[in-house]
């Protein structure tokens, strides 16, 4: 009853503020703040906003006010503190990325301890501004806000289908508005290599192209016959990194090792175990091609790639993939079998653990942290994997595990071992599981994820008592199979991404699905205007 009363009291206050401002509706806030106290009255916005900020925020304040002016049409100027009606102050007691926002009838006060906190305060402020009948105002309110999780991520797979710079920037804009802060960029896979590596130009010249694309579904023999290409130059990537940084988004690149390697092996056949020349696959699915990680030349290649990627991306974290490795080619390779014998490895699963530790150690020496899908821990999580003896252990010291597949007990065991974890449990966070929305009646093999289920997701599962502080947060994933047009991607991403944004930001005790649906209306209007949803 208390929750219901608070919900309707909040809506009444919003409605009252709207009436004071002369309108009939008022935009709610999303993701919802973790502490909010609505107060009577409104702050009426003059045509010329007078702004003061502490020197700590000088550059950030300029950027957020420019953006606010661009999006609302309001003008502003910086003034002395005594003359200001919007004041931004450094407040060391505010949590990282958090902010305070106090709006009275006479002024707006913002407090933050980080540049990101000021940025997020501005995003909230933009949602509070109401225009009606020629008037512009903000309801009086006190907000003390901070994220539930430090990692609030979105994954875009461009290896399967290249989207391009403009689309990536649009996604980054929406992530920023939703206070999401990690863009996980899946740049290589069987169907394409999308990042320029200067030392190995064939990765993009050959691996960045394919002759056609499979249509309908995995078992289909129908192809569109249209060549596909596209990749990012290193200059393109620097531009996108800078664009993301302006929005307080870290880009974590993913380069797939040792599986999902067909595009790379098509470019340089000596990277593989079979010795055969292959083409970049035109179909989707899990392929057998894997890197011959026992070959010194292949190890050098991998280090060279990681060197260029590490130099290019400021992110402390480099994602090495590691998922869905089929062991057939390793088991059939004399070189691999001898290497396993020399290294006293009992199974292909132990070989993968050895390789992950090798990459983790190398990246550590470069000042980077390795991240990989939870396959790298050696747990059996796929039906196609044989039962393997596993006595080796993945080193916890420089490794983040991204959990996507398996039961909660596997996640619990991973945390018990001391790994930091990002939770991307596929049955809750995969945006592509809703593909039947685009093609009605499609037999995908996965249960679609309705909005309410997405919203119910908790990065720390209920009943999991083991070291919840090691759960950094979540990443929702837009995998790229069948997403050959941006319009399809929009339909998959929006509005579902908003649920994951609130999962990452709003504490469980402050979540309310009915209230969330009301808050979502403002973003739906924004996305309709942009042409993302109907």
Show where each model-derived region lies:
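Flexible loop/turn segments at secondary-structure boundaries
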Residues: 59-60, 162-164, 190-196, 258-264, ...
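Contiguous, structured surface segment used for ligand recognition
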Residues: 26-149, 477, 488, 504-532
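Flexible, acidic glycine-rich loops studded with aromatic residues
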Residues: 370-375, 380-534
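Active-site neighborhood of glycoside hydrolase catalytic domains
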Residues: 264-269, 279-399, 404-413
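Bacterial Sec-dependent N-terminal signal peptides
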Residues: 1-28
């Amino acid at each position: 009853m208390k929750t219901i009363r608070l919900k309707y009291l909040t809506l009444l206050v919003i409605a009252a503020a709207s009436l004071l401002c002369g309108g009939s509706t008022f935009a709610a806030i999303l993701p919802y703040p973790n502490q909010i106290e609505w107060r009577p009255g409104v702050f009426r916005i003059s045509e010329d906003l007078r702004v003061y900020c502490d020197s700590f925020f000088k550059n950030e304040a300029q950027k957020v006010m420019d953006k606010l002016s661009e999006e609302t049409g309001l003008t502003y100027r910086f003034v002395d503190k005594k003359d200001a009606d919007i004041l931004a102050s450094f407040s060391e007691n505010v949590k990282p990325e958090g902010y305070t926002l106090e709006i009275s009838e006479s002024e707006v006060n913002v407090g933050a301890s980080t540049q990101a906190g000021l940025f997020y305060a501005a995003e909230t402020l933009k949602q509070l501004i109401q225009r009606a009948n020629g008037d512009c105002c903000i309801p009086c309110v006190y907000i003390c806000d901070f994220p539930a999780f430090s990692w609030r991520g979105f994954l875009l797979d461009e290896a399967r289908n290249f989207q391009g710079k403009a689309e990536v920037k649009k996604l980054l804009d929406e992530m920023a508005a939703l206070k999401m802060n990690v863009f996980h960029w899946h740049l290589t896979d069987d169907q394409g290599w999308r990042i320029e590596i200067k030392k190995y130009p064939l990765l993009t010249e050959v691996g960045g192209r394919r002759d056609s694309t499979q249509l309908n579904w995995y078992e289909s023999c129908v192809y569109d016959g249209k060549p596909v290409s596209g990749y990012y130059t290193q200059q393109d990537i620097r531009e996108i990194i800078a664009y993301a940084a302006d929005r307080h988004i870290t880009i974590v690149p993913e380069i797939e090792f040792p599986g999902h390697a067909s595009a790379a092996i098509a470019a340089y056949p000596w990277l593989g175990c079979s010795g055969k020349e292959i083409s970049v696959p035109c179909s989707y699915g899990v392929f057998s091609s894997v890197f011959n990680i026992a070959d010194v030349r292949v190890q050098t290649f991998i280090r060279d790639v990681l060197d260029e990627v590490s130099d290019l991306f400021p992110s402390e974290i480099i994602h090495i993939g590691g998922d869905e490795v089929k062991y057939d080619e390793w088991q059939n390779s004399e070189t691999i079998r001898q290497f396993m014998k020399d290294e006293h490895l009992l199974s292909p699963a132990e070989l993968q653990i050895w390789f992950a530790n090798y990459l983790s150690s190398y990246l550590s020496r470069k000042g980077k942290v390795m991240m990989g899908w939870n396959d790298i821990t050696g747990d059996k999580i796929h039906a196609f994997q044989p039962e393997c003896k596993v006595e080796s252990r993945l080193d916890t010291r420089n490794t983040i595990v991204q959990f996507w597949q398996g039961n909660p007990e596997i996640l619990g065991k991973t945390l018990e071992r001391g790994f930091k974890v990002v939770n991307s449990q596929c049955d809750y966070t995969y945006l592509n599981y809703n593909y039947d929305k685009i093609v009605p009646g499609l037999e995908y093999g996965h249960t679609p994820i309705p909005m309410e289920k997405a919203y119910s997701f908790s990065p720390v599962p209920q009943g999991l008592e083991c070291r919840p502080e090691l759960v950094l947060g979540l990443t929702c994933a837009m995998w790229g199979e069948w997403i050959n047009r941006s319009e399809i991607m929009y339909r998959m991403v929006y509005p579902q991404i908003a649920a994951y944004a609130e999962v990452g930001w709003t504490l469980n005790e402050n979540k309310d699905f009915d209230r969330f649906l009301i808050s979502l209306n403002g973003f739906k209007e924004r996305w309709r205007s942009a042409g993302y949803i109907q």
